[in-house]
């Protein structure tokens, strides 16, 4: 009985500390802050900056082709891209660390036509505080991050619901 009391007495604070430390990784510290500008190459070798889209709502998705949740989410992003770019949405995907050949092959095999930017040195993903993929940022017309989605969107409808935050 005394042993159980000691475990409870010392184990509970350790568990609380552990759970609070884990939740720190999921805190949304970037929300309501200005999105960091970047300059990345697209698959054609041309530079693209975030600042060139100032005045437009922007969805940025950090991903990689080897990531199963990214692969599941990609068709939903393509559908949103197809339907929402005519409404003014800018949808950028940022691949982390893969070669253009790998991405081009993946896009061809999956009939995707999204704009891909290459974060080959992982500087932009570090600046955005990416801890895993996929992670998505919704940025309003003033360049302010309004939502950070950690993990894959489960469906197109959920993405569209979140877009209401920045499409006003």
What function would you assign to each model-found segment?
Residues 1-12:
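Bacterial N-terminal signal peptides that target proteins for export
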Residues 11-20:
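Bacterial N-terminal signal peptides
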Residues 22-50:
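N-terminal "domain-start" segment that seeds a small globular fold
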Residues 54, 62-79:
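Conserved redox-active cysteine motifs that mediate thiol-disulfide chemistry
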Residues 59-60, 91:
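Hydrophobic beta-strand anchors of alpha/beta hydrolase catalytic cores
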Residues 71-110, 120-127:
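Structural microenvironment flanking redox-active thiols in thiol-disulfide oxidoreductases
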Residues 105-112, 120-166:
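Thiol/disulfide oxidoreductase modules built on the thioredoxin-like
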């Amino acid at each position: 009985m005394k042993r159980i009391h000691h475990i409870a007495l010392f184990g509970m604070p350790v568990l609380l500390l552990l759970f609070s430390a884990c939740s720190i990784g999921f805190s949304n510290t970037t929300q309501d802050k200005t999105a960091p500008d970047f300059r990345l190459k697209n698959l054609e070798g041309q530079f693209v900056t975030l600042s060139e889209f100032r005045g437009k709502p922007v969805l940025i998705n950090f991903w990689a082709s080897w990531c199963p949740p990214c692969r599941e989410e990609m068709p939903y992003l393509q559908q949103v891209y197809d339907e929402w770019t005519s409404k003014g949405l800018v949808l950028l995907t940022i691949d982390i660390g893969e070669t253009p050949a790998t991405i081009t092959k993946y896009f061809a095999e999956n009939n995707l036509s999204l704009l891909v930017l290459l974060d080959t040195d992982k500087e932009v993903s570090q600046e955005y505080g990416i801890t895993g993929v996929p992670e998505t940022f919704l940025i309003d017309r003033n360049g302010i991050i309004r939502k950070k989605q950690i993990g894959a969107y489960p469906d197109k409808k959920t993405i569209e619901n979140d877009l209401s935050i920045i499409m006003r």
